């Protein structure tokens, strides 16, 4: 659990830095990879992943990250995202770059 909290803290710090570097951008974050999503499609571990997503969202909230600056995404296939926000948003160029950076730093 301690290691899990450390990872979440690192992810929160990274999202906060992206927000600071990209004023006005909406940052897209995912709590699992495309490979993990393939497992979800088989019906495995869905509850576990949703719990991880909730923990991350709660950590972002505690860290003072504005909800309107972050949208959670599930990777469905290359180039297509199913948004898990209350409203759907189109990602601007800065957010696409931030999302790519987040994925690269969390493989």
Task: Describe each model-derived feature in a short phrase.
Residues 47-104:
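Amphipathic protein-protein interaction modules
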Residues 2-46:
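Extended, charge-biased low-complexity segments
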């Amino acid at each position: 659990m301690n290691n899990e909290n450390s990872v979440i803290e690192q992810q929160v710090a990274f999202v906060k830095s992206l927000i600071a570097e990209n004023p006005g951008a909406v940052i897209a974050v995912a709590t699992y990879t495309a490979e993990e999503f393939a497992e979800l499609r088989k019906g495995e571990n869905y509850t576990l992943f949703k719990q991880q997503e909730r923990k991350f969202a709660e950590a972002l909230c505690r860290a003072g990250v504005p909800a309107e600056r972050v949208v959670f995404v599930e990777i469905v296939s290359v180039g297509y995202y199913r948004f898990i926000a209350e409203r759907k948003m189109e990602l601007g160029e800065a957010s696409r770059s931030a999302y790519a950076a987040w994925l690269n730093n969390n493989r």
